[in-house]
């Protein structure tokens, strides 16, 4: 009972929940607009559909390939450093996506964005595990999973609202600002400072 009531840094854990949500949010925010966006550059229906599928898959493929290496890097240099760098990388890679001049340009940009996010979920899990009592780890990680599903819901909603109100390119820029804020919060975290980032 004493262990269950042991104090821990809730601000750190909440920041990790937010980050977990935004990792999914960043990938899903373009879903409502991607087909129309690509349709500005391609004119055959089958080509638009195929390219849309490839673009959505590119980020996931990048994450699959980079996750083992990012996880290994985090073990060596620290989870906070890798987390902050990955979030900043994602934010930066969203900017050129708003200014493409041909549909194929989205493929390498989404792939690189996926690579920057690959392995960050294990970083989040490790940070949570190191900051909560052992008897509460399961519950806190459960909330982290719920946060990811919130990102899966809020990402497309956000993209749809922004795209409907201001157009498709601002979806990428607005997502960039959200990810940049999360990266800044992670970088400025007292625990990250204490660990030398």
Regions found by a protein language model. Name each.
Residues 9-30, 111:
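Pair of pore-lining "gating" transmembrane helices in MFS-fold secondary transporters
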Residues 60-68, 152-153:
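Residue-level signature of mid-helix packing/kink "hotspots" within the transmembrane helices
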Residues 65-78, 163:
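Helix-to-loop junctions at the C-terminal end of transmembrane segments
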Residues 93, 104-112:
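Paired small-residue
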Residues 119-132:
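Intracellular juxtamembrane helix-capping segments at the cytosolic ends
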């Amino acid at each position: 009972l004493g262990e269950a009531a042991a104090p821990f840094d809730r601000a750190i854990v909440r920041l990790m929940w937010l980050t977990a949500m935004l990792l999914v949010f960043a990938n899903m925010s373009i879903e409502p607009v991607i087909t129309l966006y690509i349709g500005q550059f391609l004119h055959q229906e089958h080509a638009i559909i195929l390219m849309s599928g490839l673009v959505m898959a590119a980020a996931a493929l990048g994450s699959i390939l980079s996750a083992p290496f990012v996880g290994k890097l985090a073990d060596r240099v620290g989870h906070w450093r890798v987390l902050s760098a990955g979030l900043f990388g994602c934010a930066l890679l969203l900017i050129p996506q708003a200014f493409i001049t041909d549909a194929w340009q989205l493929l390498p940009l989404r792939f690189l964005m996926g690579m920057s996010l690959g392995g960050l979920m294990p970083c989040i899990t490790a940070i949570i595990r190191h900051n909560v009592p052992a008897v509460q780890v399961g519950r806190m990680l459960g909330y982290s999973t719920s946060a990811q599903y919130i990102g899966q819901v809020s990402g497309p909603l956000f993209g749809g609202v922004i795209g409907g109100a201001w157009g498709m390119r601002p979806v990428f820029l607005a997502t960039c600002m959200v990810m940049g804020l999360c990266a800044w919060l992670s970088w400025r975290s007292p625990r990250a400072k204490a660990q030398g980032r």
